[in-house]
């Protein structure tokens, strides 16, 4: 049995009617490869590629390090941002003059790069030349192959380079979504696009499933939420048409990848602020014999070796307070909690929560500290304390303080007018500022 077919059977187990209805994980993640014309064509391409290159799933690909990127090697993004400054400045629809091309390529021809990425577009074979765009999820870079020129196939990133014209054959077997690595000189095409003139190509991995629609992405919110890997692929491949609706005064919608990156920056900024103010990060038990720390229904499990029931924690509060008793004056934990309750687009049964405790301080000090952390985090993530959301500008340079009573009365519905009565008296806090 061919390798591709064996892999298909492993990824595509038969489902019973009961499994299809009840087992969401199997239904969503088990049947990865559907049997249709497109997947059969991709499996056929994989078998032909294996016959051509031998190992169709190599362990590594060595990239150059000319651009001084944070990764320490050249990525698609670092190459585009390092060399696009050499491209002529053109208006929309305008092409560079021969003089502009000659000047730009005289400078760029000195640079030979090795980069790798996913095919962001289907290969375009135009007579004796072919083009395709590689993507690393952030930027795209066009690569160019000429049929008359020998394109070497690299079977290994460091050695065993076969100097033949088989590279052209390999290029014709590539599908949208495949991963490849290429080596070649950087240049500007006649249309003014930064490209790599390929001299060596290495096949890295085959995409056995067709890629999402590059114009519309994935519109089903259920699929986007449950299959984030597919959503990430779709958002990185999506083409901006200029027709996307955008409300005046609002920022464009972030891509899925940008949301991941901003969340990472947010977590890093919060940790940095706490660390710089003397807090110690700790990890407290996820499994507890008693569900405590909040009024919520817990997830229950059983420890076989100890033969006891345990609960996934709903909050780390009690364990953090024990550390205060033990002598730590400032502790925090940024970790997962689990609450076996409702689920919606805004509420997940498992979620990340920051909880921290400080000895010898009162509520006013804590409010000051939280405001400072909020401002530093927004500045680190957004680059400004003012940002646009839902048509309005939110200014984090100052945060209004309200008592619980004031907040409820200000935002209550008419049916809750009784709250502003003798039955709801007293302020919880006073703003000393």
Predicted regions and their residues:
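Basic polycationic patches enriched in arginine
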Residues: 6-7
